[in-house]
Amino acid sequence: TWANGYDAAGQPHFDVQAANLAWQEGKVIVVQAYNTHPAPGESEAPEGFTVDKLLNGVYDAELRRFAGELRQYGKPTFFISGREPNGIGADYFGGFGPTGDKSLQWAIENKRGFAEFNPSTLPYSALYSDIGTPQVCDGVERLKAAQRYYYDFFFRREGLKFLTFDSMGWAVHQLNQIDYDVADLPATVDKTYAKQLLQSCHSFANFYPGDQYVDWVSLDFYMIDYYAKDWPGLTQDYVIPIEDHFAALDAVLREVQTVAPNKPVFFMEFGFPDGMQQSSSWAAQKITTGLSRIIAGYPQINGFAMWSGHP
């Protein structure tokens, strides 16, 4: 259960009383500091938030206050560093441009998705000694840096040893999703460059911050269909076979196995919706087939959380 909220300024606050009550009820406590998605209007971060500001210590005073609230609770707590940064509408990842305030669209249109993030001059630069590769998507390298910063801040500096860190809920996409995304771009865009950038941004290997900074690999897996009536811009329905969903999951798990073979996997979000419908015979069929396959055929998956909006 969530035990923290955000005030009008986008600062996190932890409800110790509510967390203790949830603990007594046998619930797992989940918290987040700032969502590492620097989009305008993001409600789970201060106005104008960027990963670069986070790494420069701009928010340290508020994070220290938040750490104090967590310390009052002091029991095992699941810490997420962001939500589904590569999901549908992942229009920022961790930010692009020299200061990390630009969008993925900006990076594609201006052909500036690489080599503009250099963490070597930041405080605690040793955390990022292998980050800043010119051939890797800047937005995903900022996510990696943010994960390391959060871990170092809360675990090492603040001593909150009871926190267990996930990996932001990396979204499972259809195998051909990048091709669809590139095809939807306007003709004025260099689509060869766009595909190169998208492939780099959506690589789990590029994103993974390293075993030292992650306790759980968290994935978001929805066996969702896309109906034109629900999704702006769609001109036809896309009903995706169950086998295609599992082919996409298998592809991501192969990436996970390559870079994090010893880490348990957790579905931070998991659902079987029929488009946006929460109950239909097709959704029920997906639940029956999908859930049994997950439980019987994927021993590396140690748990899941059903997402309330998409059961």
What are these regions (language model features)?
Residues 1, 27-33, 77-81, 162-164, ...:
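Hydrophobic faces of well-ordered beta-strands that scaffold small-molecule active sites
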Residues 2-17, 37-40, 52-61, 169-179, ...:
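Acidic-and-aromatic substrate-binding clefts and catalytic sites of carbohydrate-active enzymes
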Residues 3-6, 83-84, 95-121, 129-136, ...:
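Cell-envelope and extracellular/periplasmic
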Residues 9-166, 170, 188-191, 198:
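Substrate-binding cleft of extracellular glycoside hydrolase catalytic domains
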Residues 10-20, 61-66, 174-209, 243-257, ...:
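Alpha-helical scaffolding within the catalytic cores
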Residues 13-34, 212-277:
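Glycoside hydrolase catalytic-domain groove-lining segments
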Residues 65, 70, 139-155, 234-237, ...:
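Long, well-ordered alpha-helical scaffolding segments within enzyme catalytic domains
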Residues 77, 263-311:
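Substrate-binding cleft of secreted/luminal carbohydrate-active enzymes
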